């Protein structure tokens, strides 16, 4: 457990630094659309899909090594880079199980409730500082 936490921490730090670097590098492209975050979400989703398929399809990783790879890259790096990638993988898993209605519901609830949470959190703090 200790080594896994260290791997998650290292990966998370690298992912967060990568997200910061990408958002800074793309900040001048558009002031209206957060291009950097959009790219992080898309790139993170691409990487998590590739990692999931790679870990499933190859015999290079046994269960123990796979746990370390997931901890460093998926939970750590991609968790620091974006959490949207995990959300996207969850949706893919639902679709692969033939649960399209549940996947659509999950998308709608996640996006709507997350947006509501952001709005509530924003206005709660704004109210404190009035």
From Swiss-Prot:
HAMAP family with a match to the protein in the record: FluC
Disulfide bonds: none
Database matches in NCBIfam families: crcB
Name listed for the protein in its UniProt record: Fluoride-specific ion channel FluC
Residue ranges crossing the lipid bilayer per the database entry: 2-22, 35-55, 72-92, 107-127
A GO CC annotation given for this chain: plasma membrane
Binding-site positions, Na(+): 79, 82
Keyword Transport attributed: yes
Any one GO biological process: cellular detoxification of fluoride
Function (record text): Fluoride-specific ion channel. Important for reducing fluoride concentration in the cell, thus reducing its toxicity.
GO molecular function, one term: fluoride channel activity
Pfam families from the UniProt entry: CRCB (PF02537)
Compartments where found: Cell inner membrane
Regulation: Na(+) is not transported, but it plays an essential structural role and its presence is essential for fluoride channel function.
The organism of origin for this protein: Francisella philomiragia subsp. philomiragia (strain ATCC 25017 / CCUG 19701 / FSC 153 / O#319-036)
Catalytic activity: fluoride(in) = fluoride(out)
Record membrane topology: Multi-pass membrane protein
Record key words, sorted: Cell inner membrane, Cell membrane, Ion channel, Ion transport, Membrane, Metal-binding, Sodium, Transmembrane, Transmembrane helix, Transport
Lineage of the organism: Bacteria, Pseudomonadati, Pseudomonadota, Gammaproteobacteria, Thiotrichales
Family: Belongs to the fluoride channel Fluc/FEX (TC 1.A.43) family.
